[in-house]
């Protein structure tokens, strides 16, 4: 397709903006019925907010023929138990796209992770992967909010392990473990963690912890291991005037005693750490 943005906007533009995206009208013009002004008046009604489910996304690039194409993920890319990629960046950019395109408050109506949850010998369910997932996704949502996105609410999928569409009881998305044979419930570690997220209004998220340890890496290792921008985009360690985003330490940093921004040590110089 010439423009994949209307994957969502084909359905949302008529409702929120009062017209269909031009890309879709052009591509499907020979198949579409006549769309009248009366149709659009009926479709485009006043609404108070937009609700959107966001779970993951995929990398796309321009192919040799100028058309968009999917980019294969490297081996070992993190995935959920149902084989969905873990992509908090897609959550961030999805929120930004929606709130910039549609001038209404946004609610995330679904987001969560299926894990291989098991009851441990201590009788508890230690779903650390889910905590890591939620920490990164909710942190991405806060980042979008801090940058001006009008996001009003977030609904985690889900409270209890349940019947998940065509996958039945195989996928466990809940914060509370359900033994489907006995109906016994066990509160998972993620539920206690999420309770703290609510109680502290996100204060326990890793992005809000001032005790986060600064990463001092050799410049060569930074590029070879982490990649040119991963420290900036994933860990938010930025130094003023550093377009790479790497924080290597005073001796290695090209800007010398730089000032940190967008992390728990915001405003401090490297020499003050």
Spans of model-derived segments:
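Phosphate-bearing ligand-interacting subdomains
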Residues: 271-273
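N-terminal subdomain of nucleotide-sugar transferases
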Residues: 212-259, 263-268
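Active-site region of glycoside hydrolase catalytic domains
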Residues: 1-211
């Amino acid at each position: 397709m010439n423009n994949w943005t209307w994957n969502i906007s084909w359905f949302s533009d008529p409702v929120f903006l009062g017209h269909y995206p031009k890309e879709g009208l052009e591509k499907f013009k020979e198949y579409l019925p006549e769309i009248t002004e009366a149709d659009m008046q009926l479709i485009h009604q006043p609404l108070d907010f937009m609700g959107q489910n966001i779970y993951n996304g995929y990398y796309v690039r321009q192919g040799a023929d100028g058309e968009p194409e999917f980019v294969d993920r490297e081996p070992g890319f993190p995935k959920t138990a149902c084989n969905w990629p873990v992509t908090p960046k897609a959550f961030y950019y999805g929120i930004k796209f929606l709130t910039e395109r549609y001038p209404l408050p946004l609610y995330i109506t679904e987001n969560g992770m299926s894990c291989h949850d098991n009851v441990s010998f201590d009788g508890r369910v230690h779903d650390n992967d889910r905590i890591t997932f939620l920490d990164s996704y909710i942190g991405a949502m806060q980042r979008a909010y801090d940058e001006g996105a009008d996001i009003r609410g977030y609904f985690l999928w889900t409270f209890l392990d349940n019947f998940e569409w065509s996958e039945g009881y195989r996928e466990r998305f809940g914060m509370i473990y359900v033994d489907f044979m006995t109906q016994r419930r066990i509160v998972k570690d993620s539920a206690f963690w999420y309770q703290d997220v609510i109680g502290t209004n996100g204060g326990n998220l890793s992005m809000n912890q001032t005790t986060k340890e600064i990463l001092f890496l050799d410049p060569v290792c930074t590029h070879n291991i982490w990649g040119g921008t991963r420290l900036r985009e994933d860990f938010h360690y930025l130094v003023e005037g550093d377009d790479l985003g790497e924080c290597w330490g005073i001796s290695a940093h090209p800007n010398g005693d730089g000032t940190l921004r967008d992390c728990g040590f915001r405003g401090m110089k490297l020499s003050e750490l």
